[in-house]
Every structure is written in structure tokens, then in C-alpha cells.
Amino acid sequence: LYPQAPNASGRQLVRLSPHNGDDAQNSGCDLPEGLLPVVMEQAIKGKPKGGPAFWSVQDLWAWQQGQDLDFETVNRQGASSMPVELRTHVKIESRSWAAEEGKLFQTAAYDLGNAKKPHHAGWEEAHYGFLVQSEVMLNDDLAKFGGEGRLSHVKQTQAISGFECPTDLASNIERAGGLRLTLLSPAIFSGGYLPGWLNPTSKEGVLPHSQVKVRLRAVAMDRWLPVSGWDLDQNKPKAMRKAVAAGAVYWFELLEGS
């Protein structure tokens, strides 16, 4: 969270963690059975403020390792939102191929191009993009990308550091008796907010591709995201599904296995 005390000059960066005190089960929340409330590790009187929704890989990794970060650094290296481009369209009559009067609609899409500088000073040098790992060699080229088939530039780049698995990760998890899982992208689970491999009653299950049995103890997440689209094969809208938003954190307790 990014709270700001009433008399403070800037915002703070505060961790959230499960609360397992004597009053945990009487917190006044309608949490699912067996889950602990997630609270601030520091008691700060103040309301949450806005801040970067997207963090740099380096800041995210440092935060996961328990390092302290300041709001100014995270805000400078992160982003509050992705730029969105709105386009206005007209409906085309199928027989005459002419625009139907009054039939206007808009579409919105992420704008990953170079942003404009203020005061007509040109364009920013850096821009956003999708990072894709491929099993085959891809040459620099132009391609249609996304649901609208936008013309995009495919360019080779160096692998980004920060996603390597630490050699001591397994021993640290075993020593702590649990692990914390953070979603880097939205996820659709068969159990709503619960992955399908977890028992909805006991909140226990075996981690995929392992023999490690865990129990879910707490969850911190934003509102669900709607996922839908247009089915070209059936010529109708796809059924809407609910996805867990990126940034959701799941706390697990180790039960069996190593």
C-alpha cells in the first residue's frame, strides 16, 4: 500500500502480511473459512493514495527478498497505468458498404508506441512492448499482432535479468515453512480465486509438478478482471470469464514434501 499520514510530506511504502494473532478469526471480515486477514505490518494513520501499479523487475525482486524500498524510487522506475488509445469507428452496411448514419462506436487498446513529449518537444525515446520468448529464431520484421491485427515491429532483444530462479530458493522456503506466490499476469482458475488443485473446503493441495503439499493461509488481491472477446468461428461474443488480477499474492503453509 501507499499510505500517507495526515501531516507527512510524502507517501510511504508499507508491506501487507497475514495476521495470525488471537483476534485473527474475529476481525469482522467475511473471509472464507480458514483464511487469515491481511494487514499492514506498520500501523500508519492515513488513507491509501495512488501509486505505481506496475513495478520494475529489479524493484519487485528486491521487495520479494524483504528489502526496504522508498516510494520515490518505485514511482520513478514504475508506471501507474498503461497508455490507452481510443478510436472512433462507423458501422458499415453489408450490402452497400456505406456508413450507416448515427452508428458510431469506440474501441480502446493499449498504445505501446513512443509517447509525445510535452510542449511539442518530439517523442520519448523509450516505449512499452511485449516480451516474448520463442523456441525458434525470429528475425526483425513487421507482423500483425493482437485481436485487431495492429501492425507491429518484431525485434530481437537481450534476455532480461531478474527471472532466474535463485539456487537457495528451495532451502529458504523449507526453512520458513511456507512460501508466497505473486501473479505476474492475470490468471483464470477453475475455482474462482482458488487454483483448481486446491480443495475448496480445506484449502489444501499439492503444488503442480511437485510432491509438495501446502495449505492456503491468506490472499491479497484486487478486484476480478472480465475476460471476453468475439468468437469468429461462432460469430458471437465469447462467454465472459473472471480472472484474478496481476499482482495478487497467495501465502501457503508447507505441510508435506520438500
Residue ranges and their predicted role:
Residues L1-S258:
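Conserved active-site/ligand-binding neighborhood in enzyme cores
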